[in-house]
From Swiss-Prot:
Keywords: Cytoplasm, Methyltransferase, rRNA processing, S-adenosyl-L-methionine, Transferase. Disulfide bonds: none annotated. It catalyses: uridine(2552) in 23S rRNA + S-adenosyl-L-methionine = 2'-O-methyluridine(2552) in 23S rRNA + S-adenosyl-L-homocysteine + H(+). It is found in: Cytoplasm. Belongs to the class I-like SAM-binding methyltransferase superfamily. RNA methyltransferase RlmE family. Its main location: cytoplasm. This is Ribosomal RNA large subunit methyltransferase E. It comes from Burkholderia ambifaria (strain ATCC BAA-244 / DSM 16087 / CCUG 44356 / LMG 19182 / AMMD). Pfam families: FtsJ. The keyword Glycosyltransferase does not apply.
Amino acid sequence: MAKNRFNQNWLHDHINDPYVKMAQREGYRARAAYKLKEIDEQDKLIRPGQVIVDLGATPGSWSQYARNKLAQGKKRDTQREGGIDGTIIALDLLPMEPIADVHFIQGDFREDDVLRQLEDVLEGRAVDLVISDMAPNLSGVASADAARIEHLCDLALEFAQNHLKPDGALLVKCFHGSGYSQIVEKFKQQFKVVAPRKPKASRDKSSETFILGRQLKQPR
């Protein structure tokens, strides 16, 4: 009974969520687009000519926002291939519906085949910005969930270390709670500038937060 009440309350909140309504109106696949938008407007992350990698991209709202941002200022028809000033590569274990001008690679980015596909698109270029909205399936067991969250952040940090430009940036989703301070410390070990971000589009009841790292301390 309590579970049904929880589901009904969540559905009510979701339907009446202004960000959900705005996403539907503006064509975004998820309200998460506005989290990235707010952080981008604050920190000026996305700029013309950049190479951007979106980890855990499905359903694609972050890639959509990045694509729209890179399309601004293009005089040609931005719905056609080549309609953005830059490159966006989206990766996920799950399938994703195509987005114009976004290269999608399905698979585990730790595997050689996926990395080869990534390198084919990069054509020797380093990455300006890595964004990760990856999140594990939470079990409700705090210690287990903290370990899963930290693992995903570790994967994003390793990917960034291997692919970012020296002055590049990494933005990842994490959660306040057990293990959060360890994640922040790992960011500080890897980046010169580290800042937490809690966009207004992130639900008040959620412990979700984001960590932004800029300028690698030891670029490869």
